[in-house]
């Protein structure tokens, strides 16, 4: 009678031994069907694990506080009667409102009603596209305008007001300093109580100022005053320069 055998390495005896041909090195043999089932099960486990690792996109909203409300996904309202009415908006604080897309309102009664507008501070207000108001009662109502400081105001397009009660009320106007005021187009006023009323005028210093008709004029120094009167068909006729404390340049072309 023929015997079918083979030689394998024994892990127990640490030598080669003669065994039946159906024996294996690592233990009992498995059929092809069993091996395929094991491989298929491993593949399913791999897919399940991969699914767990893939991030999921979830739209969510959150509101907390008496009477707070959110009307769209991806918005947050926190505080009594805080309200958001568009996607990607944030309202934090009592009676805050963020009512246009990407708007942010933070602080008691803060309101951000322009697209991409931000209002931070009690009673702060930001109403125009991409406007920014920072400070209690700060108001930014011009497109791309910025107001920083208590009661500061930036009402002109791309205007900037920095300081308590600073006001930039024309296009591209810049007012820097407590109670500084700029009403001239493209004008700059820097210093406490500085006032730039003329178009494209620059005033620097406490109480320095330019007249409304003194276009293209400069006043530098405490109390410096740039006047002048623009003539028809002469864009530079009113240009005056006053430099020094209480300096005055009142006639066209004065220095």
Regions from the PLM with identified roles:
Residues 4, 10, 20-24, 28-42, ...:
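Glycine- and small/polar-enriched repetitive beta-structure motifs of secreted/surface proteins
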């Amino acid at each position: 009678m023929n015997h079918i055998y083979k030689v394998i390495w024994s892990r127990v005896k640490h030598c080669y031994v003669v065994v039946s041909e159906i024996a294996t090195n690592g233990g009992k043999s498995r059929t092809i069907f069993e091996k395929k089932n094991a491989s298929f099960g491993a593949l399913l486990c791999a897919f399940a694990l991969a699914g767990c690792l893939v991030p999921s996109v979830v739209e969510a909203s959150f509101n907390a506080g008496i009477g707070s409300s959110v009307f769209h996904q991806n918005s947050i309202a926190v505080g009594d009667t805080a309200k958001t009415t568009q996607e990607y908006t944030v309202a934090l604080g009592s009676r805050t409102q963020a009512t246009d897309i990407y708007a942010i309102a933070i602080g008691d009664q803060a309101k951000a009603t322009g697209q991409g507008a931000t209002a931070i501070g009690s009673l702060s207000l930001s109403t125009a596209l991409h406007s920014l108001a920072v400070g209690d009662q700060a108001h930014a109502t011009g497109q791309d305008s910025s107001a920083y400081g208590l009661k500061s105001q930036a009402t002109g397009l791309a205007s900037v007001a920095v300081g308590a009660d600073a006001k930039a009320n024309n296009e591209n106007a810049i007012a820097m300093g407590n109670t500084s005021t700029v009403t001239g187009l493209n004008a700059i006023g820097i210093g406490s109580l500085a006032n730039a009323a003329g178009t494209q005028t620059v005033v620097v210093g406490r109480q320095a100022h330019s007249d409304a008709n003194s276009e293209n004029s400069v006043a530098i120094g405490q109390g410096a005053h740039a006047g002048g009167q623009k003539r028809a068909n002469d864009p530079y006729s009113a240009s005056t320069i006053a430099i020094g404390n209480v300096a005055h340049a009142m006639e066209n072309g004065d220095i």
